């Protein structure tokens, strides 16, 4: 099974949607909250090239945010990850 890291904040609606989508597909993930840690948000920029949340990494590779996760679902990739 793949390792999924999900960088989120408490106030982010797209973060909630990303979590729900992963759970719907039975994909476990590690949630890393970045709301109260400016230094960690800077590290997020280094990891992904983006400041926005959610940011999702699959096996250490940044895939983007919620829109990119939905696109992977549309293409059937999420079901392959769970196999």
Placement of each model-derived feature along the sequence:
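Local sequence-structure signature of Cys/Sec-based thiol-disulfide redox active-site neighborhoods
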Residues: 1-28
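Residues at alpha-helix termini
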Residues: 25, 47-48
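A general structural signal for well-ordered alpha-helical segments in protein cores
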Residues: 41, 50-53, 75
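Structural micro-motif
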Residues: 48-57, 67
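Non-catalytic, surface beta->alpha helical segment in thiol-disulfide oxidoreductase systems
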Residues: 58-83
């Amino acid at each position: 099974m793949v390792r999924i890291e999900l960088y989120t904040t408490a106030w982010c609606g797209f973060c909630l949607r990303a979590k729900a989508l992963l759970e719907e597909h039975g994909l476990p993930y590690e949630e890393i909250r970045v709301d109260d840690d400016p230094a960690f948000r800077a590290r997020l920029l280094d990891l992904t090239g983006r400041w926005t949340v959610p940011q999702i990494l699959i096996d250490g590779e940044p895939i983007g945010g919620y829109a990119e996760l939905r696109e992977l679902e549309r293409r059937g990739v999420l079901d392959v990850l769970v196999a």
